[in-house]
Every structure is written in structure tokens, then in C-alpha cells.
């Protein structure tokens, strides 16, 4: 976690990680089976979502490979200001046991 400045509190609400090699969904399922909820915030790359299908900028030539890779690999962990040290430790142990 990033260091905090003196007399401040964090407002972190997302802790995204990149899970490569096609393991994101397996990790998501593993964590869920062990009581840890996770979220894929953009499982479909924004430019491929139906709401942008007719956007002027969204042409067949649009090529956003990094965005598409992140849509396939991003997983947000439940780490924020309300999580206890003990709960964060459980998440870390589960991550270590998965990998």
C-alpha cells in the first residue's frame, strides 16, 4: 500500500491488479470460494461496449490493444480504508497460495 502523509487518511476504494496468462477468472473464482469478493470493473473494453457502438470516434480502424488487454486481465481486490489488517493478510495469503 502507498505510504500516507502525516495527519491524512486514505480514500482508496479500488485496488486493481493485473492477472496475466489467462488466470484472472480462475483467481476471481478461487477468491470467491474462499470468501473474498472481487470485481472486474471493465470486463468489456469501454470502446467495445454497446453504448459506444455508434460513437463518432468508434470506427473500425480504432485499435486500443492495451485497453483490451486490461479488460481481460484487471481484477480489483477488496482493499480500502475499511478493511482490517487481518482481512488484508487473508487476501495476501490467498493470493500467495494461488500463485
What are these regions (language model features)?
Residues 1-99:
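PLP-dependent aminotransferase class I/II
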